[in-house]
Amino acid sequence: MNLLPKTREEFAQTDYWNEFFKKRGEKAFEWYGEYLDLCDHIHKYIKPVDKILMLGCGNSKLSMDMYDSEYRDITNIDISPVAVKKMLEQNARTRPDMKFLQMDATAMTFPDESFSVALDKGTLDALFVDDAPETKAVVENYFKEILRTMRNGGRYFCVSLLQEHILNFLVEFLPRHNCMLRIVHCLGVEQANKEKNADDAMKMPVFVVIATKFKSLPMPILEFGLGNDKMQRFTESSELSNAVRSVQKAALVFNGLARSSIAGHDEVTLDLYRPSENTPRYSIYILDQAAARGLNKYAAFIVPQGREIEWLFGTPSGRKKLQASAKFQRLAVVTLHRDQVYNTLEEVQAELGDTVFSLAPHGHIKQIPYLSLGSDVGKRETLISGFSKISGEFRIEEVEAGGKTLRRLIFLSNQFVVQSEALVKTIKIKGKKERKKIDFGYLACQHHLYMSVGVQLATTLQNPKKDVQKDVLVIGLGGGGLCSFLHAALPQSRITAVEIDPIMLEVAEQYFELKQDKRFHVVIDDGLAFVERCRNEDIHFDAVLFDVDSKDLSLGMSCPPQGFLAHDVLLHIKEIIGPKGLFMLNLVCRDETLKTEAIANLQKVFPAVCSYKLEEDINEVVYCANDEKYKTVEHWQKAMGTAGRGLNTTIKEHKLASEDPLEVAEFLSELKL
């Protein structure tokens, strides 16, 4: 494994440790591995010429196996005379040069700098049973003796489970005593434990601690490895501790998922990082559903690049639907992150292999199937990276999805939400180079289609004079997709878009082919200030649309910002649209209390309010009118039915689509007061 797992869930680690040791008793120390499991690390850090001190040998075979592998200068000590006598009898003939001495490791009688390696397999964990002051005093004596008897440049090599109090002590004590400290996740031991304890779903990560003694160190040297040769270097001890804890927390997730199903509960999320990187390379969402006839056991689903923002892959409810259609009791949904390079699907599977295996239900030994939408990892190309003073960092990306090329505006502050999306078509002209063109008939956001029905109603049915252009105000431009669509589909409309961020106008013009003309212009201004000015100057619009998001992601309402629903703002809108106009807003609200409050505020100002809730999104399009004839849902349905059919017709007439984009009957059936 070369990926560091970090879970987003919290667990009571102390309880888990207690259960681990209670369950195993004396057998807990079998968990530290044998020579074959540790030999890669031993050979890397200990040489046959080293003078080795084995601390607390007990009845371990480790020193015997090392002796048989040409490590001949080994001195074993143990506080138990029974253990020492037994080991002497066992090794006197076959390993005559190996020494066994009864000695307390906290008060050794060896001269200073006698050894080049001090080897500890579980002895520290046996000594350091709790964080009591008297225990800590014993451990400090233990380390002082180790460092006293160790030569400069010598190594303390320790196999440990690194309980929290042990880890905290090591990262503080050893650097303070001029030791370079390296901690390596020992995957070989874990794999062996899985094989030897196949019936035991409870697993704990094992670590090798390597502390190298120096005369002096001007600054701490702290490193962490995931079992490969690549080390991550830190400047702060807390960073090293956090790396270890990330592996331990992930193990708790793996153990919990191995031991029980989470069917009926929320999904569990895991992020995977490369060493030395602060942004995740993969995110994994683990879902369970109850066992049933026809369901297979376990699979992983790899979402191609750029598709992770789609409802099916980017939301908990979408992923549940994906699991149901895939027909697996457990599904691990893997998403790939931007600013990472992924070559082939096979390479991604290989990189994920250890983690995906660790997430399997207990006892699952079959090969794990990998599912995806195709045979590759998808394509994501960044066209530009930019910065907005209002919205922060943003990207313009092109992704391949379902045989289409989509151009997207993404704000990195909320990068799983697409701010704007356009369909890119390739135009072939005989004798000329192919060029890309934005398809203005493509509406990525479904709520834009339902807002457009309202615009059709306000500009044709409410004001039927064909020779008079109808004025439409859109607050919030983004990439300009909605405005470009309205401009192309409704030639009798005259559109004013208000955008607070001047960078967004540049983006819309340069990357989404937004074009201003006599029927469409953009005003750079604060939307609320513009609305107030229109009211004060007696400027009217046939339709007003709020399609603006909140920059405060902590609030339960994402669209619009709460200030846009203030009573005085709504009164301004009421005057601006006049007796025949229509006000529409995109309401995105996860908090039911806030949502109810928002609708109530609208109903206080407008005599007629109705809404349409999108099926797969949390978006709800709310329509508000001053015309009291719309007080019943039947009147809304009649007017919206005519407007919807008219919108379908004009879209096809202007060659923006070949088929009706709006399912009129379904739309009308879901309209609610």
UniProtKB/Swiss-Prot annotation:
Mention one GO biological process in which this protein takes part, according to its record. methylation
User: Which Pfam family is one of those matched by this entry?
Assistant: Spermine_synth
What are the protein's GO molecular function terms? protein-lysine N-methyltransferase activity
Q: Which Gene3D superfamilies does the entry link to?
A: Vaccinia Virus protein VP39
**Role description:** Dual methyltransferase. It catalyzes N-terminal methylation of target proteins via its C-terminus. It catalyzes dimethylation on lysine residues of target proteins via its N-terminus.
Q: Write out the similarity annotation.
A: Belongs to the methyltransferase superfamily.
Tell me what this protein is called. Answer: eEF1A lysine and N-terminal methyltransferase homolog
